[in-house]
C-alpha cells in the first residue's frame, strides 16, 4: 500500500489563502492509497477524497505544547506507516520538528517553499535550518526561494512551477468589452492592492466603471 505524509499549516477548503491545498491533497489521493495530513489548523474538509486522513493540532495549546504534540503525532504516524516521502508545505518549523524522525525512519523529506522570505529574524533562522535539514526543496521559479546560498547541496533545489490547475482558470477571449473590474487576491500589504485601486481610479475607466475586491486575510 502506497502512502504519503503531508505537513501543512491549514487544511480548509473555505480559506481564501490556503484553500487550494485541498486540490493538492486530492491530487495525491489519486496517486496513493492513503494520504495522511498533519495540519496545524483544520477547517472545512468535506471536499477531500475519502483516502485523505487529516490530523490537526489543538489550536488552544501553547507554543511548546504544540511542538511536543506535533513531534509525538509525526512519530506515531511514521512508526505505524511506511511512507514514500513526506512533503512539508511552507512550514519551516514543521520540517525541523519532523527531520530527526524522518531521518530515523529513512523517509525522504521534501520542503515546498515559494516566497521572498520572512522578515522576522527567528523565522529566517528556521527557514535556513529547514533548508539544510530537508532532502529536497521544491519551488515555483529560480527566484522564489530566498536562501539558495545557504544550501549545503545546491542540487537539492528543484524548480517545478506553480502547482495550479491552469485549465480551470484559462478562458480564451476573442474580444474585450469594457465592463466592471475585479481583483481576486489575498488581502495583505505585500499584494499592494492599494496601488491597484489607485491605478484603476486614475485610469480612463475609473470614473465610469466599478472595481470589486474579493479576498480575505491570511489569518
Q: Which ranges hold each PLM region?
A:
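Conserved donor-binding/catalytic core segment of Leloir-type glycosyltransferases
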Residues: 5-6, 173-191, 197-201, 211-217
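A short, active-site helix/loop in glycosyltransferases that binds the activated sugar's phosphate group
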Residues: 39-44, 132-170
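Short beta-strand segments
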Residues: 8, 37-39, 161, 210-215
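Conserved nucleotide-sugar phosphate-binding/catalytic loop shared by glycosyltransferases and other
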Residues: 30-69, 73-80
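A conserved, positively charged/aromatic
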Residues: 29, 109-139, 149-153
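Histidine-centered beta-alpha loop that forms part of the nucleotide-sugar donor binding/catalytic region
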Residues: 8-10, 90-91, 113-117, 142, ...
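An aromatic- and histidine-rich active-site surface loop
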Residues: 70, 83-107, 117-124
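N-terminal subdomain of nucleotide-sugar transferases
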Residues: 1-43, 189, 201-205
Amino acid at each position: 500500500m502506497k502512502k504519503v505524509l503531508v505537513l501543512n499549516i491549514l487544511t480548509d477548503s473555505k480559506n481564501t489563502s490556503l484553500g487550494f491545498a485541498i486540490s493538492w491533497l486530492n491530487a495525491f489521493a489519486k496517486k496513493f492509497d492513503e494520504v495522511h495530513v498533519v495540519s496545524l489548523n483544520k477547517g472545512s474538509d468535506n471536499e477531500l477524497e475519502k483516502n485523505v486522513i487529516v490530523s490537526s493540532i489543538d489550536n488552544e495549546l501553547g507554543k511548546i505544547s504544540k511542538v511536543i504534540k506535533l513531534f509525538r503525532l509525526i512519530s506515531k504516524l511514521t512508526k505505524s506507516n511506511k511512507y514514500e516521502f513526506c512533503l512539508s508545505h511552507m512550514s519551516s518549523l514543521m520540517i525541523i520538528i519532523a527531520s530527526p524522525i524522518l531521518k530515523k525512519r529513512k523517509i525522504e523529506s521534501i520542503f515546498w517553499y515559494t516566497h521572498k522570505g520572512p522578515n522576522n529574524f527567528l523565522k529566517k533562522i528556521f527557514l535556513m535550518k529547514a533548508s539544510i535539514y530537508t532532502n529536497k526543496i521544491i519551488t515555483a521559479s529560480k527566484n522564489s526561494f530566498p536562501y539558495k546560498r545557504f544550501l549545503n547541496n545546491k542540487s537539492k533545489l528543484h524548480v517545478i512551477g506553480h502547482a495550479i490547475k491552469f485549465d480551470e482558470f484559462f478562458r480564451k477571449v476573442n474580444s474585450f468589452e469594457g465592463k466592471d473590474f475585479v481583483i481576486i487576491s489575498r488581502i495583505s500589504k505585500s499584494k499592494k492592492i492599494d496601488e491597484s485601486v489607485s491605478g484603476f481610479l486614475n485610469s480612463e475607466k475609473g470614473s465610469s466603471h466599478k472595481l470589486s475586491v474579493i479576498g480575505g486575510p491570511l489569518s
